[in-house]
């Protein structure tokens, strides 16, 4: 699905690891909100340390042991703060894109012995429903020329 990015607002975001700037966007195609959480000058020709991170309420807010999403997000923000420059693209794609309620349904199936992929298939979803086209639009909006992508 192609995105239609709409910029909403920018604000400071003080965190435990440093002060970031948060940019809020909405994808008008699906009404989902996404964030670019950056630090430092992103407009240079040097690659910008970047992470694409999908929202995970169960891991990030409730410290679920089913995933390492909280660690990945914290580590990414820490690395950016240590470098003094970078951005996390935080996407509203809970549960590999199936949404929070369906993620809980998948957890129930996992409790019964299914793995994540099998559970998603049982619920009628592909193994991963996420899309990343919005990130390209966010990169362009922020004027970033090249990225140095952090992975799991």
PLM features: residue spans?
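Catalytic domains of riboflavin
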Residues: 1-152
């Amino acid at each position: 699905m192609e995105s239609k990015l709409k910029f909403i607002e920018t604000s400071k975001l003080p965190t435990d690891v440093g002060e970031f700037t948060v940019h809020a966007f909405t994808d008008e195609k699906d009404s989902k909100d996404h964030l670019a959480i950056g630090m430092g000058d992103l407009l240079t020709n040097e690659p910008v340390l970047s992470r694409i991170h999908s929202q995970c309420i169960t891991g990030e807010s409730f410290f679920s042991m089913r995933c390492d999403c909280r660690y990945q997000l914290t580590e990414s923000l820490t690395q950016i703060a240590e470098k003094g420059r970078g951005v996390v693209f935080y996407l509203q794609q809970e549960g590999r894109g199936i949404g929070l309620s369906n993620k809980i349904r998948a957890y129930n199936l996992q409790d019964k012995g299914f793995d994540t992929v099998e559970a998603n298939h049982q619920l009628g979803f592909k193994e991963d429903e996420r899309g990343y086209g919005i990130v390209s639009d966010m990169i362009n909006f922020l004027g970033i020329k090249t990225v140095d992508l952090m992975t799991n």
